[in-house]
Amino acid sequence: MTADMVWRDVKKRFKAFLGKGRGAAIAPQMNQVEKASSVITDRMIIDRFTSDADNTFLVSFPRTGSHWLRMLMELYFERPSLVRIFYYPNRQDYLTLHSHDLDLKIERRNVIYLYRTPVDTIFSQLYYHKEPVSSRQRIEHWTELYGRHLDKWLCKEAFTGKKTIVTYEGMRQDLVAEFARVAGHFERPLDRRRLDAVAGKISKDEVKRKTGHDPQVVQLEESYVDIRSRFRAEHERFVWDVLTRGRPYLGDYFETETFERK
């Protein structure tokens, strides 16, 4: 993936910032640690990170838990990631660059890939975009995109030299074991006490506070859970049928509670 491709992705995702003349949002202009998050839109900074093939990219389909993981990583390693920074705006030793890779053009040697069970991912995506959660057409649209994403990053890519796979469900069930993979990716032993302290800070309310730029990131209303339960009951089979259509092997990467890593 070239620096130009990364820059186009940044411009697309953070058009509002660039449109307000914040294209050089370097550290002195950012919020402090305990305030809301900030965005780096300085192309020189992004190009410098991207030009080093050994730097880590964090790749995830939308609505798979990347905000939570990035906040954990930033506090645990005390290093920010590009391009949104949550806690350490005055540091420039960036740990990763996050991308959703929706156009499936990213090819990097060093990658952490985060994924989540497809039914909940698709529901969350529909809800985020305020699309009708009962529309089979929209369900199929997002499921097909996610299926291609999973197929690329779990099965078909042949360009990574170092790839660590992390799951949202694994983080929820056993954060210590799952985050140990992340620590290992950066050749660091897991510090259990440090992780416990960091995880204790990052509640859903904290993620909500740090993502005030986008109120749709975290849903706290009680009705959300009920609507999701109905979606699961009515559309789970359809989501799996679309996901595995032409890709039957994708089912091997999921279990009822935790996921296999091939």
Task: Indicate where each model-derived feature is located.
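PAPS-dependent sulfotransferase catalytic domain
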Residues: 100-227, 237
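ATP-binding Walker
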Residues: 64
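A conserved segment at the C-terminal end of the G1
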Residues: 67-78
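The Walker A (P-loop) glycine that initiates the GxxxxGKT/S ATP-binding motif of P-loop NTPases
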Residues: 59-60
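Residue-level preference for short coil/turn positions at secondary-structure junctions
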Residues: 52-54, 92, 107-108, 159
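PAPS-dependent sulfotransferases, especially Golgi type II membrane carbohydrate sulfotransferases
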Residues: 1-56, 126, 188-262
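Cysteine-dependent PTP/DSP-like catalytic domain, specifically the C-terminal lobe
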Residues: 80-104
